[in-house]
């Protein structure tokens, strides 16, 4: 066994490769992005020709993974928590179809919303879809679980959801890894068509089958190597800890816990262990990262007055946990903390100097001064920072692709002018259908597709629509007369402002594409070019 220092994301990626992975499908989103990037750069993955291209969105990623599974091979789907909303349709239905080759759906939740718009807990999706969920407590488990999850997926013929959180994904630890990776599955034709064609007659049978499996899945959770019941000597308190929450608990007891601890890293919740904990201990503390998912269920098993956690305020309901927070919940004193930020001047996030989005907002703000009550609907990406000073340019940002459809809805309500601003990667992710709606109804909106030739905010991944946006807009039915392309530079400001002014005054759907490469990827490409010239 070799030892490697790995991020949680890297441990997951390497675990998948060593488990005989044939393809990863993903849309970049913090904190899950590094999984796919690691696979793309891994020597074994390259040698084997593993599929590792970015997908257009999470839904297409999930469906492609199901196609690979249909042919008997092992697939990995990666996304951040809100991406699971996007692929909910195929994800939930994958519980009905089942799998042929193993499928692991890796979802990275973001408590404290470091780079997200909500704190949703993906474990609810696993329960809703009736599929098992794994939640590693450390990087070693994250690596080891991948092989276990694929074997389990193929044994029970269901996909497996694996849930991690930001701190697990982006912290490093030494991980023992296998010397030799497992071989990939061979192509096979064992998939039963009746399971995969979800006509009502077939789906009813599959629904009965999956529902009947739940008792076995719970038995498997009780016998899982990742769920442990460690009896303590002090029965005043029992602790149920899940995922990384277990690590935080153990940090509070470096020489061992006097209390009984139930560690949960595989779901459905092992109720047999929970009942034992409730029977043996006077009080129970639930330590879980995210929503009170387990706590809600445990309160239905015993006297809720004896259950403590997020619902009674023992632990904070929002934000990340950490060892100090858990110590406080246990009534223990935590050491004094050094505040590294006490003397540091605040530096809020801002668009990079030289960024093309800056020039777009400068021009847009200049033009919108000429109108009464303009509204600008923003989207997810670097350009969302246009909400902050000095631009203060956008009035909404809800979810991927919402800018165009919200602008259309506002125009339907009588708002004018209604402007949508969306990035290139977000447009192909989920903006095209909204533009089609607008074009079909000739909605009175102006759409700005701010194209920086990359998926910038998550690190400069390839953008699916690069060099295709004009063709896409024409294909959706937009006329060339109201499809404009500009280069966002200060020297072009008179031209850009006039085009924005003209298209706002046109009463119909128009699209403006300001196109200039992201400054970060431009600098990276220049460095690569210089390095290549020196060779």
Where do the PLM segments sit?
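Flexible, low-complexity linker and terminal segments
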Residues: 1-9, 19, 136-351, 356-357, ...
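Thiamine diphosphate
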Residues: 1-139, 167, 232, 258, 387-511, 517-532, ...
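Short acidic, glycine/serine/threonine-rich loops at helix termini
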Residues: 35-38, 64-66, 87-91, 113-120, ...
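Short helix-loop-beta junction
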Residues: 40-45, 250-261, 471-480
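A glycine-rich helix N-cap at a beta->alpha junction
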Residues: 46-55, 97-108, 188-194, 440-453, ...
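Short, acidic loop-beta-alpha module within alpha/beta folds
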Residues: 72, 234-259, 401, 405-407, ...
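Short beta-strand segments
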Residues: 78-79, 104-108, 161-165, 240-241, ...
């Amino acid at each position: 066994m070799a030892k490697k220092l790995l991020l949680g994301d890297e441990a997951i990626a390497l675990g998948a490769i060593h488990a005989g992975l044939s393809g990863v499908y993903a849309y970049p989103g913090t904190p899950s992005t590094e999984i796919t990037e690691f696979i793309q750069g891994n020597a074994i993955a390259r040698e084997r020709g593993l599929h590792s291209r970015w997908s257009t969105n999470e839904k297409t990623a999930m469906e492609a993974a199901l196609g690979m599974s249909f042919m008997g091979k092992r697939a990995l789907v990666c996304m951040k928590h809100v991406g699971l909303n996007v692929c909910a349709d195929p994800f939930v239905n994958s519980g009905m179809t089942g799998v042929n080759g193993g499928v692991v759906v890796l979802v990275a939740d973001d408590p404290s919303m470091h780079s997200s718009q909500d704190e949703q807990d993906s474990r609810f999706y696993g329960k809703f879809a009736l599929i098992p969920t794994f939640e590693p407590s450390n990087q070693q488990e994250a690596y080891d679980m991948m092989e276990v999850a694929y074997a389990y997926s193929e044994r029970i013929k269901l996909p497996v959801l694996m849930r991690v959180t930001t701190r697990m994904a982006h912290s490093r630890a030494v991980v023992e890894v296998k010397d030799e990776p497992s071989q990939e599955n061979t192509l096979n034709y064992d998939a039963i068509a009746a399971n995969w064609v979800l006509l009502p007659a077939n789906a009813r049978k599959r629904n009965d089958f999956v529902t009947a499996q739940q008792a076995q899945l719970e038995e498997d959770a009780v016998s899982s190597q990742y769920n442990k019941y460690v009896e303590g000597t002090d029965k005043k308190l029992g602790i149920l800890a899940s995922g990384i929450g277990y690590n935080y608990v153990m940090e509070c007891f470096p020489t061992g816990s006097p209390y009984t601890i139930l560690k949960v890293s595989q779901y459905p919740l092992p109720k047999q262990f929970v009942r034992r904990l409730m029977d043996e201990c006077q009080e129970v503390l639930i330590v879980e990262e995210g929503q009170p998912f387990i706590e809600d269920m445990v309160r239905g098993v015993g006297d809720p007055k004896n259950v403590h956690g997020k619902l009674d305020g023992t632990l904070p309901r929002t934000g990340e946990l950490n060892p100090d927070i858990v110590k406080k919940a246990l009534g223990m004193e935590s050491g004094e903390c050094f505040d590294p930020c006490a003397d540091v001047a605040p530096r809020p996030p801002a668009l990079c100097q030289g960024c093309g989005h800056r020039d777009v907002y400068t021009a847009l703000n200049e033009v919108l001064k000429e109108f009464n009550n303009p509204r600008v609907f923003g989207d997810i990406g670097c350009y969302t920072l246009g909400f902050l000073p000095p631009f203060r340019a956008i009035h909404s940002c809800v979810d991927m692709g919402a800018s165009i459809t919200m602008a259309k809805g506002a125009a339907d309500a009588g708002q004018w002018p209604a402007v949508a601003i969306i990035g290139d990667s977000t447009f192909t992710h989920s903006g095209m259908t909204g533009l089609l709606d607008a074009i079909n109804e000739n909605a009175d909106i102006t759409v700005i597709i701010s194209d920086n030739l990359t998926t910038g905010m998550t690190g400069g991944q390839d953008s699916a629509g690069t060099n295709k946006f004009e063709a896409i807009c024409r294909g959706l039915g937009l006329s060339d007369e109201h499809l404009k392309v500009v280069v966002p530079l200060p020297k072009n400001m008179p031209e850009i402002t006039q085009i924005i002014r003209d298209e706002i005054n046109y009463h119909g759907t128009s699209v403006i594409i300001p196109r200039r490469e992201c400054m970060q990827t431009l600098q990276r490409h220049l460095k690569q070019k210089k390095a290549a010239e020196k060779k």
